[in-house]
């Protein structure tokens, strides 16, 4: 939703009329229907620099290069340089799509073919449907990188990203259906990959009753794609039957899980460089530039920054490889549900009612991780003992330190293994959904609505707090005074009189560990990035067709939808924060600039540059969505023109 503020896309779409081949012989019926479309979209506005990473803003490539915008001598100036700079703190993991397309650039030009084969024989029906698409604009486009300290200015997109939205073929429906009757009641059994639409929500898909078929966001943003192409068919068995006049039931069991498909990382509408084929994540709140190959190391002392001592003792980078996408996938089994449908002829001249239950595994990914390795100084009593425990540390001075200690040849150990945290996309299992819906007519409007309730819906904990929890083992348990470390070793360092290496509690004070009662995070401990809550959601939809209109269209279909979500028993912000995905994300803990500290004074031991106080999920939220579908038939050579206006 946040990109609505800055994206205006011009779209041109020509949808070819469907053409079909039909064949019939006795009880055998064969139909092949093909639908082709061509569409293009163009970016119409410049970038908003507040939405891209601080180190990706033009002129700020070296913003923190000299000192990592961190001070070990309690000097607030490096952090304030970061705070005052243009750009988004957390944008480093979500701005590739913004950087790849300039104003007036085509962001997509998709040709799409949807082929649907149906073979009927008596009471049996076999359906196989597939979609092929090609986008020459994105298939040939390279990734663009503003910051080139640790990578080139251009790079090739990986095959997985290209397959999501640039060139691929996808099997959609593939199922066998059998129509029969029991006690003079009609019944249908279908088995295979298919779509089952529950509920009445049209434009608000997330957390609606229409949960069975996960959406494909890449298809949603393809100019020319149809609504029936957005939701992915899944493998399941479905039994639909009449119980009595006006009363019916659906029973289903899903035997194959599929996730929602996010926009490909780096595509125009993407909001994450991790989900959708991303291969690495930056552990950064604005200070560290993109480093896909883990080439960067902490800053070292210089004339410009004599206090940057981390590089003397550590070789950690500030990026990490993402575990394979399938790592956090749930099991295929254990997903089932039922629907009861009732046609209430006595209500408003005819109203369809539905009652639902579904047990399913999440289609949406959550950011979870395994905690970092233990710092070799995690339990060292002081810096001198840490020097021995770490075999002379693991930085640029290691060889000299080992020689002075008389331990040459021992493998150096890492005091700050920040880049050993392991991030993965997590899909929680066994979410329960209960719901009801209605569908009726009021005047010339088709009006429908639904309510869904989930007693154990996972919600994403603020990602920076999840990361802070995972980084607890990567620093000493207590602050380490490094001031007197150099003299006993005979080393002259360009350092001031006070130097402090912050402990984990000072650098990464978090909320998630306290909320879950974790006294000490262990190395490699699994940190689930979600917390389950009771959540209810209501949607109301109105649809009206206009054949007579001032735009000369053959028809305009107007869809209006309102929705509201309630999170029950959401804890206050001083206990836990739920991610809302704003560009200015930092962390709700105290900032190095003094925000959130008891006395308001800067405390440079904190990695968090400034406290975030807004932009979290709230107990109640609501919104409106609308779409006008305009149709101009047979514009030229049998092609139709179908512009869409989405608000």
Language model features: what each stretch is:
Residues 15-17:
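N-terminal signal peptide c-region/cleavage motif recognized by signal peptidases
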Residues 20-32, 44-47, 107, 117-126, ...:
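Short loop/turn motifs that connect adjacent beta-strands in outer-membrane beta-barrel proteins
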Residues 28, 107-111, 167-172, 231-235, ...:
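Residues that define the transmembrane beta-barrel architecture of outer-membrane proteins
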Residues 34, 113-119, 128, 173-178, ...:
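Residues on the lipid-exposed face of transmembrane beta-strands in outer-membrane beta-barrel proteins
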Residues 38-44, 132-136, 193-197, 253-259, ...:
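Transmembrane beta-strands of outer-membrane beta-barrel pores
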Residues 50-95, 139-162, 210-222, 263, ...:
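Solvent-exposed loop segments that connect transmembrane elements
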Residues 106-108, 358, 448, 515-647:
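Detector for outer-membrane/organellar transmembrane beta-barrel domains
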Residues 120-278, 623-625, 642-644:
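Outer membrane beta-barrel
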């Amino acid at each position: 939703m946040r990109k609505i503020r800055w994206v205006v896309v011009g779209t041109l779409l020509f949808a070819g009329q469907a053409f079909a081949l039909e064949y019939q012989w006795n009880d055998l019926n064969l139909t092949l229907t093909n639908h082709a479309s061509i569409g293009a979209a163009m970016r119409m506005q410049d970038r908003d620099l507040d939405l891209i990473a601080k180190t990706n803003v033009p002129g700020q490539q070296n913003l923190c290069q000299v000192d990592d915008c961190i001070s070990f001598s309690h000097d607030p100036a490096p952090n304030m340089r970061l705070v005052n700079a243009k750009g988004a703190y957390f944008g480093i993991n979500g701005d590739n799509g913004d950087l790849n397309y300039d104003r007036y650039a085509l962001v997509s030009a998709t040709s799409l073919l949807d082929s649907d084969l149906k073979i009927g024989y008596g009471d049996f029906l076999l359906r196989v449907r597939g979609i092929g698409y090609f986008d020459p604009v994105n298939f040939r486009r390279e990734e663009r990188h503003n910051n080139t300290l640790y990578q080139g200015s251009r790079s090739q997109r990986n095959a997985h990203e290209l397959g999501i939205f640039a060139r691929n073929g996808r099997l959609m429906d593939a199922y066998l259906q059998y129509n029969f009757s029991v006690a003079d009641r009609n019944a249908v059994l279908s088995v295979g990959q298919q779509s089952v639409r529950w509920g009445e929500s049209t434009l608000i898909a997330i957390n609606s009753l229409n949960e069975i078929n996960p959406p494909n966001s890449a298809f949603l943003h393809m100019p020319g794609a149809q609504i029936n192409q957005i939701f992915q068919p899944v493998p399941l068995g479905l039994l639909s039957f009449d119980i009595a006049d006006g009363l019916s039931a659906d029973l289903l069991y899903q035997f194959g899980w599929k996730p929602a498909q996010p926009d490909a990382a780096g595509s125009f509408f993407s909001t994450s460089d991790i989900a959708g084929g991303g291969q690495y994540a930056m552990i950064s709140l604005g200070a560290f530039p993109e480093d896909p190959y883990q080439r960067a190391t902490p800053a070292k002392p210089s004339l410009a920054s004599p206090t940057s001592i981390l590089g003397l003792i550590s070789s950690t980078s500030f990026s990490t490889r993402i575990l394979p996408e399938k790592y956090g996938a749930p099991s295929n089994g254990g997903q089932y549900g039922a629907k009861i449908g009732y046609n209430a002829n006595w209500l408003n001249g005819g109203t369809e009612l539905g009652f639902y239950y579904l047990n399913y595994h999440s289609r949406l990914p959550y950011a979870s991780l395994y905690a970092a390795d233990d710092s070799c100084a995690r339990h060292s009593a002081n810096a001198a003992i840490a020097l021995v425990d770490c075999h002379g540390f693991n930085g640029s001075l290691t060889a000299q330190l080992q020689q002075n200690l008389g331990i040459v040849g021992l493998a150096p150990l890492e005091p700050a293994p920040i880049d050993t945290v392991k991030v993965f996309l997590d899909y929680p299992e066994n979410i329960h959904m209960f719901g009801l819906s209605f569908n009726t007519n009021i005047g010339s409007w088709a009006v429908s609505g639904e309510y869904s309730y989930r007693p154990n819906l996972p919600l994403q904990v603020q990602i920076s707090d999840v990361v802070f929890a995972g980084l607890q083992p990567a620093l000493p348990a207590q602050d380490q005074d490094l001031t007197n470390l150099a003299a006993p070793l005979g080393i002259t360092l360009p350092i001031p009189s006070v130097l402090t290496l912050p402990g984990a509690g000072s650098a990464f004070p978090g909320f998630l560990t306290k909320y879950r009662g974790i006294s000490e995070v262990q190395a490699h401990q699994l940190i689930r990035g979600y917390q389950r809550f009771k959540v209810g959601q209501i949607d109301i939809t109105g649809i009206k067709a206009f054949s007579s209109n001032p735009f000369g269209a053959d028809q305009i279909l107007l869809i209006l939808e309102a929705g509201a979500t309630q999170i029950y028993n959401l804890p206050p912000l001083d206990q836990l924060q739920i991610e809302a995905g704003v560009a200015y994300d930092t962390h709700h803990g105290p900032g190095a600039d003094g925000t959130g500290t008891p006395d308001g004074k800067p405390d440079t031991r904190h990695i968090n540059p400034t406290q975030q106080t807004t932009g979290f999920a709230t107990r109640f939220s609501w919104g409106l969505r609308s779409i006008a579908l305009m149709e101009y038939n047979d514009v030229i050579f049998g092609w139709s023109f179908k512009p869409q206006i989405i608000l």
